[in-house]
A protein has these predicted regions:
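Flavin-dependent oxidoreductases
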Residues: 27-137
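C-terminal catalytic lobe of FAD-dependent flavoproteins
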Residues: 139, 144-216
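A conserved short coil-to-beta-strand element within the FAD-binding core of flavoproteins
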Residues: 14-34
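A short alpha-helix-loop-beta-strand transition element characteristic
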Residues: 15-17, 66-71, 187-189
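Short beta-strand to alpha-helix junction loop
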Residues: 1-7, 19, 163-173
Length: 216
């Protein structure tokens, strides 16, 4: 993703600036502008849009927002159909969603390049940018597991969560879920794909903020 950002900025041939590997320390607001103070310098802008992703809550607090909710990361693993099996999916295939769960469920997505993605599952990740199954951050884990909203989410979805973890480490169980929609799929039809991490905004009661958290 970072490489694509660099390529896009260079292709625009504009006055854009791209600064990587900098930590935001705080924000200063004046009548004329907003200053972003990082560990490498200060940047000033008339208008500022912060797209924080998995760090959105931490950046909001650094900007003085009294945010009770907390971002907790959930990793989603994907499989891909092999080239020989792509003919089995002609369009998007989704399961009927369960409104009791904050996740959509495993589905099939035809990509623009012809690839067919199958997934994702949804498992708690021990690192906010934990795209690997064994990625770990002490800070992120402590931050999530000392928040009561995390435990309330866990306990209210215990069986769902256990099944998701089992599927994360078992290709056979993942395939079994896919076969509910396409029974003819076999182990040879799927191969490991990418993974992503969802920034789930959790309230203290374990409820998820599915859309926007707006503060005036």
């Amino acid at each position: 993703a970072t490489k694509k950002m660099v390529e896009l900025a260079l292709s625009m041939n504009s006055n854009s600036e791209l600064h990587l590997q900098e930590e935001v320390i705080r924000f200063n607001h004046t009548a004329e502008s907003t200053e972003v103070i990082t560990n490498h310098g200060t940047y000033s802008a008339t208008h500022l849009i912060v797209c924080g992703g998995l760090q959105a809550d931490r950046l909001a607090r650094k900007d003085g927002v009294q945010l009770k909710e907390k971002v907790v990361g959930f990793r989603g693993d994907y499989y891909e159909l092999t080239h020989e099996a792509r003919h089995k999916v002609k369009h998007l295939i989704y399961p009927t969603p369960n409104p009791d769960f904050p996740f959509l469920g495993v589905h099939f997505t035809r990509m623009t390049d012809g690839e067919i993605e199958c997934g994702p599952n949804a498992v708690f990740t021990f690192k906010r940018e934990g795209y690997g199954k064994t990625d770990f951050s002490l800070r992120d884990t402590w931050d999530a597991l000392t928040y009561k909203g995390t435990w309330k989410l866990f306990f209210s979805n215990m069986s769902f969560g256990i099944n998701e973890y089992r599927r994360a480490f078992s290709k056979k169980l993942f395939l079994k879920t896919l076969q509910r929609m396409i029974p003819s799929l076999t182990m040879d039809d799927i191969k490991p794909g990418r993974s992503g991490v969802r920034a789930l905004l959790l309230a203290e009661d374990g409820d998820t903020r599915d859309d926007f958290r707006i503060e005036y």
